Amino acid sequence: MTTLSPYDSMTPVTQAAYRAKAAAADLAPLPRAEKDDALLAIADALEVRTSEIVAANAKDVERAREAGTSEAIIDRLTLTPERVRAIAADVRDVVALPDPVGEVVRGSTLPNGIDLRQVRVPLGVVGIIYEARPNVTVDAAALCLKSGNAVLLRGSASAYESNTALVRVLRDAVGGAGLPADAVQLVPGESRDSVRELMRARGLVDVLIPRGGASLIRTVVEESTVPVIETGTGNCHVYVDAQADLDMAVDILINSKAQRPSVCNSAETLLVHQDIAAEFLPRALDALADAGVTVHADERVLAYAKDSKATVVEATTEDWDTEYLSYDIAAAVVDSLDRAVAHIRLWSSGHTEAIVTTSQQAARRFTQLVDSTTVAVNASTRFTDGGEFGFGAEIGISTQKLHARGPMGLPELTSTKYIVTGDGHVRR
């Protein structure tokens, strides 16, 4: 009589999750040196097998062009030899970061003589659901391995060939370094059914992190039974206060909007105090025009745009709620700082908001009242980034309040546990 394995009745996604859970248990106690050796092996393998990766990526790019995909999306999808080498360099940067696992968060000797320590431990199995950029495959795997986690990767169908090749290289390197290869897996299947199954793998997958557009994130948050860390969209604001330095305000505005408009920390709305609007807006509109930005203006901004060279269209309600990720920005004049805050509270995604002001009182009030992951004073919204904050690489930028908020580095990929050490202590 043939004895069936429990795996025989499982779907491929569930099997992968069980393998990841077993791998996570093996990873958790490993010392930093062994994890770093695996990461160095990954970096070397990426460089050695660059041609294999680029060839696989070319299939995705060709398919995207045939489907009429925009050049902006194709650029994010494309891997060149230079980009693969840059990804390998990023992995080596992760090696240099401190290992958070085992860090004592707090500890003390209790009055009864018990030694109590709270220490960082891996989350376990991390699922990443993401869109077109295949570099996320390697970034996520490197950060999860460094923090002692197994990772289940579900990229978009548009990058299937690229992700398959990358994960093959990653698994070979990890296994060759003596770590469990199942610590890095691509979720089987290209259909949405595999995504739904991953989202319902509670008990096997410890956390899901979606990275992508608003629709993807909303779907994961609403449908997942696995706990989710929401890396929200970036409807970021720049508020120019009545007491702003105008030269500084123009520089911050243009950098926030136009340096790299397709990322989540670019500014999507400009708010200008009415007392400075007549002096500031003509300059700002011309600068935005020079940067190629279209302005979606309220009626008060439109009044200052008549003699401007800017491309200006009338704003609708939808504009205040839009993450453009393009050379577009919404703009409004507000009566006061408090009205700016009210606008932000109504429309912001909770990512990053900036104030430009020379008034310490205004800056203090703005930072106290605005409830976003990052509030910048006289600085661009573009600084909300793990690398810019000195955290090294990041898994995403969380816009929720539980577990992690803001750029998520290695410590945010850990939880904690308490270690209680006694000498025959019993509770009476």
From Swiss-Prot:
Any one GO BP annotation for this protein: L-proline biosynthetic process
PANTHER family, alphabetized: DELTA-1-PYRROLINE-5-CARBOXYLATE SYNTHASE, GLUTAMATE SEMIALDEHYDE DEHYDROGENASE
Subcellular location: Cytoplasm
Similarity annotation: Belongs to the gamma-glutamyl phosphate reductase family.
InterPro entries for the chain: Ald_DH/histidinol_DH, Ald_DH_C, Ald_DH_N, Aldehyde_DH_dom, G-glutamylP_reductase_CS, Glu-5-SA_DH, GPR_dom
GO-annotated molecular function: glutamate-5-semialdehyde dehydrogenase activity; NADP binding
Assigned keywords, A-Z: Amino-acid biosynthesis, Cytoplasm, NADP, Oxidoreductase, Proline biosynthesis
Top-level taxonomy: Bacteria, Bacillati, Actinomycetota, Actinomycetes, Kitasatosporales
Leading EC class: oxidoreductase
One protein family per Pfam: Aldedh
Keyword Electron transport part of the UniProt annotation: no
EC numbers for this chain: 1.2.1.41
Name of this chain's protein: Gamma-glutamyl phosphate reductase
Function in brief: Catalyzes the NADPH-dependent reduction of L-glutamate 5-phosphate into L-glutamate 5-semialdehyde and phosphate. The product spontaneously undergoes cyclization to form 1-pyrroline-5-carboxylate.
Organism: Streptomyces avermitilis (strain ATCC 31267 / DSM 46492 / JCM 5070 / NBRC 14893 / NCIMB 12804 / NRRL 8165 / MA-4680)
NCBIfam families in UniProt: PRK00197.1, proA
Metabolic or biological pathway, per its Swiss-Prot or TrEMBL entry: Amino-acid biosynthesis; L-proline biosynthesis; L-glutamate 5-semialdehyde from L-glutamate: step 2/2
